[in-house]
Swiss-Prot record:
GO cellular component terms attached to this protein's record: DNA-directed RNA polymerase complex
Organism in which the protein naturally occurs: Rhodopseudomonas palustris (strain BisB18)
EC numbers for this chain: 2.7.7.6
Superkingdom, taxonomy of origin: Bacteria
NCBIfam families: rpoZ
Biological processes annotated in GO: DNA-templated transcription
Subunit architecture: The RNAP catalytic core consists of 2 alpha, 1 beta, 1 beta' and 1 omega subunit. When a sigma factor is associated with the core the holoenzyme is formed, which can initiate transcription.
GO MF, one annotated term: DNA binding
Chain spans, region Disordered: 80-130
Protein's name according to its UniProt entry: DNA-directed RNA polymerase subunit omega
Keyword match Nucleotide-binding: no
Catalytic activity: RNA(n) + a ribonucleoside 5'-triphosphate = RNA(n+1) + diphosphate
Length: 130
C-alpha cells in the first residue's frame, strides 16, 4: 500500500526527500490530534498522510509552511519604525549658530616644561625574576 501511495505522491511533490519530510510532519500532526481529511481504513498515520497528499485533500505548500513554522525557534516580529529623530549634527548646529568659533589654546614650550616639572616622577618597581 505504501509503495503505491509514494508513487502517487511524486506527482504532487517533485522531490521524494521533501515528500518524506512533509508526510512525516503530517503524520506527527495526526498523532497529536489533527483532523483527518480522508477515511483511515485501518492505515497507520504515515500511510494516511501520504494518501492525503496523493488525493490532494491537503496542500503540500501548506504542509511545507507549517513544517517550517514548527521548526523555527525564533519568530521575527516586524515592529513599526520609530518616528524620525533629528540628527544630532542638525540639532547642534542651531544651538551653536550664535557662538563664535572656539580656537584651541596654544601652549609654549616653556609653559609645557614648567608643567612637567611639577609632576612627580613615576615610582620604579623592582623587576621580578620568573
Amino acid at each position: 500500500m505504501a509503495r503505491v501511495t509514494v508513487e502517487d505522491c511524486i506527482d504532487k511533490v517533485d522531490n521524494r526527500f521533501d515528500l518524506v519530510l512533509l508526510a512525516a510532519h503530517r503524520a506527527r500532526m495526526i498523532s497529536s490530534g489533527s483532523q483527518l481529511t480522508i477515511d483511515r481504513d485501518n492505515d497507520k498515520n504515515p500511510v494516511v498522510s501520504l494518501r492525503e497528499i496523493a488525493e490532494e485533500t491537503i496542500s503540500p505548500e501548506d504542509l511545507r509552511e507549517e513544517l517550517v513554522h514548527s521548526l523555527q525557534k525564533f519568530v521575527e516580529v516586524d515592529e513599526p519604525e520609530p518616528d524620525t529623530v533629528p540628527l544630532i549634527g542638525s540639532a547642534g548646529a542651531s544651538v551653536d549658530a550664535d557662538d563664535t568659533e572656539v580656537a584651541p589654546e596654544r601652549m609654549t614650550e616653556e609653559e609645557l616644561l614648567k608643567g612637567l616639572e611639577g609632576l612627580a616622577p613615576p615610582e620604579e618597581q623592582p623587576e621580578e625574576d620568573e
